[in-house]
Amino acid sequence: MFKNLSLKVIVFGFIFTFFSSFGQSFFLGIFNTSIRETLSITHGQFGSIYASATLCSSLLLIWVGKKIDDINIFRFAIYVTLLLSFSCFFFSKISSIVFLFSAIFLMRFSGQGMMSHTATTTVSRYFTKSRGRALSICWFGLSSAEFILPVLMVFLLSLIHI
């Protein structure tokens, strides 16, 4: 079906779409209640902060996203992975409204934005004939994460009683 390099590119795309989940709403929503309780904010306030941070991250994606054409894809992927790692750490330290906005901005930008963008651009770049099939397999990573991560995270949070 796919040759050696092609398989590696598809696995790369699958992994990047899987881990884009850390910036997706279905994952971040797991922490909604605990964040609102910690910061004493309403659903509406949280939603406004979330929407604003998402909009700002998408605006930045317009500028940063084009850099993938100027930088070696391996190096670009490392930068994106490091940014997502930092974003997850930063998200775990939310202690104020400003931190909340910044953390959501970083998670949405690095996770939902850059991880997805890197996966799609890389797979699209390597495939011409079977691009649709390759992208479908790549995006199965997100579907897998939507099934696995919420259950796993709720289980892990129950172990530490959060």
Mark where each language-model region is:
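Conserved MFS/SLC helix-loop-helix module at the cytosolic interface between two early adjacent transmembrane helices
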Residues: 59-97
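Intracellular juxtamembrane helix-capping segments at the cytosolic ends
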Residues: 113-127
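Extracytoplasmic
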Residues: 9-43, 61-64, 149-153
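Glycine-rich segments within core transmembrane alpha-helices of 12-TM secondary carriers
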Residues: 130-150
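Hydrophobic core of transmembrane alpha-helices in multi-pass small-molecule transporters
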Residues: 18, 98-114
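Conserved small/polar residues in nucleotide/adenosyl-binding loops
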Residues: 160-162
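Juxtamembrane helix-start elements in MFS-like secondary transporters
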Residues: 41-50, 135
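Residue-level signature of mid-helix packing/kink "hotspots" within the transmembrane helices
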Residues: 54-62, 146-147
